């Protein structure tokens, strides 16, 4: 697998929406597409795409809080036919390192997700901080997780790359 990650561009929109739709309904309710469209039109932070063989196979971004020592991951998704290939881990590591390079680097990074994807984040070193039955308007349960973006975590990501930094056994 040879992927590259770069900033999202408006001409990526169609491929990003197609990647999102490939995950409906298993990972996203169709109703979240309007939120994605809004985020693409008026992002609150940087957005990125993962590209493999010239095709967009993943998408995600983050937002930084103006008032809190906090970054929030938004729309981390991989095209359904590429799940399990490591693209999600690479995109996650890229976003964490991008945040770490910011002038106002956040101390904590949070993400909210569905129970079926919470395990992915736990294997990448996130800890569960809240669980909300029916926490999404769609009726799905919500899980909130946090990653401590410490100097040690950043050094591990830089030194050994995303594969080794996010050990499959859950130790990060």
What is each model feature region?
Residues 1-34, 51, 156-172:
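Short amphipathic alpha-helix that is part of the acyltransferase structural core
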Residues 26-49, 61:
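Active-site rim helix/loop that mediates acceptor-substrate recognition in acyltransferases
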Residues 45-49, 59, 75, 108, ...:
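Short hydrophobic/aromatic beta-strand element in the GNAT-like acyltransferase core
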Residues 49, 55-64, 70-77:
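Conserved beta-strand in the GNAT
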Residues 78, 84-97:
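Conserved acetyl-CoA-binding loop-helix of GNAT-fold acetyltransferases
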Residues 99-114:
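Conserved GNAT acetyl-CoA-binding A-motif
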